[in-house]
Amino acid sequence: MSSSSVSNTLSIETKSDPKDPAFVASQESTECNEHDTTQLSGSSSEPLENNSSLTRSTDDPSVEIRSKLVSPDNEANLLSDQNITISNENNNENDTTEEAETSSGNEAADDEDSSSDAQSSVPSFSEIHDGMSEEELDKERKTLTHLRRISLQGADDPEIPTDWSVAMSPPETEQDASTLFWVPANLHPELNPTGWKSFLDLQVKNLKSPTATDTSSSPLEHIRSLRRRKSLLSRQVKADDAVINYQDGSPIVEKAYLKRHRSLRLNELEHLESLARDPHRMVSLVDGMSNGSPEDSPLLVSPNHFLQRSSRTTIRRTGASIRTIHRGKTSTLSGNRSHSILQKPTDTSPLHKIEPISADELVESDDSRTSALSNSQNPSDDVENQSDQALEVLSLTNPPKIDNASADTTLHKETNKIDKLYVSENKAESAVASESSLSEGTLALKAPAPENKPEKSSTSKPPVPENKAEDSVVLKSSVPEDKSENSIASKPSATEGIPENAIALQSSVPENKAEDSVVLKSSVPEDKSEDSVPSKSSVLEDKHENSVEIDKKADDSLPSNNKTEGYTPSVVREEKNYSEPNASPSVIPPRVPTPVPGRTLSPKPTRIPTPIPSSLNVSLESSKKPEIFHERHIPTPETGPNKPSKNNILKSTQVPVTPKQKSSTANKGSTSSPSPPSSESKKTKRSWGRLFVSGDSDKEHKEHKKDKQKKKNDQISSSSKSASSFKKDRDKESIFGSLFGSKKKQTEIPPVSSSPPHNDAPPKAKPISAPSELPNTTSVAEAKCQTVTDDEGTDQQSDEKSTEPKTFIPDKDYYWSRFPICTERAIYRLSHIKLSNAHRPLFQQVLLSNFMYSYLDLISRISSNRPMNNVQQSTAKPIRKDINGQQRRSEFSAENVKNELENLSYQFGDQRKRNLNRKGSTIHTVSQNIQKVSKNAK
């Protein structure tokens, strides 16, 4: 009865769509409440009064679920507030209900006891209501409603944006799941630090002022959807697409591409050519352009001016060696230029109206330019200025436009004048070249280079014209000014700025010894020669006290049939160069010498040719043949198969001198030693010995070796023979044998002084003998006499010296040097560390990587040239002793320490390579190997 009355009395006014999920939720809640009332109505009327009322306001579109405990005091207010009308259909029914309730009082008392027990176990609504405020209840209801909606819509997909009004609310507890919000991947702090920071700032701002929370300010508002979009290329063109206004875009794209990348057409090229011919139109066209940036302005180049490659290229290398390459004569260049002038287009532009320059003015300007060149002090600048004269003169000659016929005649006249002018210039230059070639006496000069690098030295072979045979050369010794000048420079054929009488031929000798340089002088009358010779050379000549003695000894060494009273011998220095006897008439330009600081070249004097003396015929014949100069030391047959023997060394060129020198040389007298007769005949066979090792050189080498061995058999004891053979075997198996080629580059002239072995000369930079015994011994004949007339004690001393090990000095014997292995490893590791820094500038990274790779190349080269068995043999060798049995040097000398350090470094390097290949290597094995190496060293 009570259930039916409840259903009749509770009427819920709802005006909404039954499909609304909020309406469904309200229906579910009403069903639950009705079920509760049916259970409680049978026992008493209090559950009916305490029943929670459900309402839906017609004004509010949303549904609010409210649970309130209703007391009998505010029952009327509650009913009026929530718009629930309870119709009293029959007062009799109310009375009957009250009677029924009172009649069943005893039963209700029993039921209340059982219900009170159930309420004691479950918390009642009053207890929950007392602990929560109204705002908290409203918040909980909103959260439940939001979760209900998400669960009904299936919002478990994280691609759906969250409700920022709920997600940005202040958290209740740290473990509350509702306070967590989903952050998209593009706001990750490592991927997008600025976006993450702005997102956190927005969170803090919303937490501080929750009323100003705006859901539209979320960082995801620009994201349409996180789902994968459909590909735009997935659509296929169909036949019926034309109905839907489909248009193929490929022709449009192709037209746009051709418009951007098409080449110039013929009419456009013609238009550009016409603009180039008429600069006024070009200027007016450019002025008419608006908003043109200055860097976009066109380059107005006249069509008759064109870029031409220089006729000469000067290649500058380190080491003061300059090489000049000529590509053509100035006459051909002038002919080409005149041809281009004849083809000059006709235009009335004022830019091209230049008054013609007469040939006389050209000659005057050329003479002034030549005189200025002769007064300059820089030889390299003179060479460059001399070759640029043709282009400078031709650039000034640009005749104006008159008539066609008159212009042709004028142009022909001007070009003929220019051609004649430059033909005369070429003749003068060829005369200068012939003078320089004869003054040098066809001496093949080149810069000194290490013996294992012949490609760095260039050869100059000027010809010897017979009609210029009256020129003579006087060779005098002078002191060089700089030790670093290692190049012997000859006078260029086309150089006018360098006087003929002041060409210095310099060669360097190691340490502090005075060098002997050769100055070539042209023989002129006495008054002219005194004026033209620089005063510095005379002062330097006075400084050398031993120059007279050298000339005297060299004079004695000349052949008797070539000796005349008026000739003075020249100081000969051997050079690793061979000239071809039948040289071509074309002049190969020699190296241009670098200017020496502090040295002033005197201007070129007027040349007065002297008649050819009858006694000069023999000297001319010998001057036509190539001559060999000593540069640093006198090599012997042991200097390699491509080196000349003593028999192949020619005497110096014999030339006439001034009367003063005749009087000075007439007083000299001495016995002359005959020279080998086969020197000239053998020399002609070895013209290209530098480039090709011929069989003749090997035969000569063997023959000379046999002769020398026969001479030594009478003087050298058996012990010295065994020592020399031991030395040869040691040289073959030496550590640096493969690095420096053969050991035959050492000189065979025995040093007289007993200098310590570690001061022995490197093959390229050590004098022949000690300064105390052989001062400035430079002539070939004197060196021969020294080798032949040496006594037995000197030979034994040289043989004893040969048994000592050869010590190589860094930066003298070889161009590389190594640090201790620990230092090298530290440098290498530091380079790796520095290279790993990406902020380091690029040029520093390049320098470091170049250093590392050059270091690795050096280590690999040394390791490949130094086998380990030789290293172990060298470590096991006992300390060498003299013939007398005395210890030669200390065990802890610099050489022994250096050798031991190198052995340790190589052993450790190989062990490290093996450890890298074998992954299971440990530090213990490395230490054991080091101990073994140290034991072997001891």
Swiss-Prot record:
- Region annotation Disordered: residue ranges? 1-140, 326-386, 424-807
Residue ranges annotated as compositionally biased, kind Basic and acidic residues, are: 57-67, 127-140, 467-485, 512-556, 622-635, 798-807
Q: Which UniProt keywords apply?
A: Cell wall biogenesis/degradation, Cytoplasm, Meiosis
Care to name a GO molecular-function term for this sequence? protein phosphatase regulator activity
Which residue spans adopt a coiled-coil conformation according to this UniProt entry?
none
This chain belongs to which protein, by name? Protein zds1
Which spans does this entry mark as compositional bias, Polar residues? 1-13, 77-86, 330-349, 370-380, 558-567, 642-669
Bilayer-crossing residues are none
| Positions with biased composition (Low complexity) | 40-54, 116-126, 429-440, 715-725
Compartments in which it is found: Cytoplasm
* Gene that encodes it: zds1
Q: What does this protein do?
A: Has a role in establishing cell polarity. Also required for maintenance of cell wall integrity, sexual differentiation, calcium tolerance and cell morphology. Involved in Ras-MAPK signaling pathway at cell cortex. Has a role in meiosis.
Q: State whether keyword Plastid applies.
A: no
Matches recorded under InterPro entries = Zds1/2 (IPR040206), ZDS1_C (IPR013941)
The record's Gene Ontology biological-process terms are: cell wall organization; establishment of cell polarity; meiotic cell cycle; positive regulation of G2/M transition of mitotic cell cycle; signal transduction
Which SMART domains does the record match to this protein?
Answer: Zds_C (SM01327)
Q: List the record's Gene Ontology CC terms alphabetically.
A: cell division site; cytoplasm; cytosol
Basic residues composition-biased segments: 702-711
Q: Where is the composition biased (Pro residues)?
A: 587-596
Organism name: Schizosaccharomyces pombe (strain 972 / ATCC 24843)
